[in-house]
Amino acid sequence: AVLALCATDTLANEDCFRHESLVPNLDYERFRGSWIIAAGTSEALTQYKCWIDRFSYDDALVSKYTDSQGKNRTTIRGRTKFEGNKFTIDYNDKGKAFSAPYSVLATDYENYAIVEGCPAAANGHVIYVQIRFSVRRFHPKLGDKEMIQHYTLDQVNQHKKAIEEDLKHFNLKYEDLHSTCH
């Protein structure tokens, strides 16, 4: 029943969220852009490698990932709705298992974000660390998964102290998370 509730398009459903955000009023203008999911609490998400979310100005979302064998690249499209630190994602048919409410628990906007969500694809609950994907810092060849993995690991290492400090608020350590892109 909780999964069904979590998959609805409502920001009012608090049943999905287990933690209070450190950023109650997310600045969506600063959050917009591309983010790579580096690691998360759900082992189920490890089958989706180097997941990249691109949040755009018109509430459109384009997400790309590679399968666990690193062979098939998939693109899914959806819409987002932000309110406070929470947002919902409503993907098209191909991405429905990821349509869910999410909450930004912590972010410095420029380098990393810690997000909590309730997608069915993560067995109903996940906390994950995202790394800001900036072409100013990195410009991989299209589809070059190894370059994206290297970039992600490098960015995690550069900002690990701050990430670890924020994860402590949620009783987590980075090394306890399941890697999804390094």
From Swiss-Prot:
Superkingdom of the organism of origin: Eukaryota
SUPFAM superfamilies: Lipocalins
Signal sequence segment: 1-12
GO CC terms of this entry: extracellular region
Main location: secreted
Subcellular location per the Swiss-Prot or TrEMBL entry: Secreted
Family assignment from sequence similarity: Belongs to the calycin superfamily. Triabin family.
Its biological purpose: Probable ligand-binding protein.
Protein name (database record): Allergen Bla g 4
Source organism of the structure: Blattella germanica
Organism lineage string: Eukaryota, Metazoa, Ecdysozoa, Arthropoda, Hexapoda
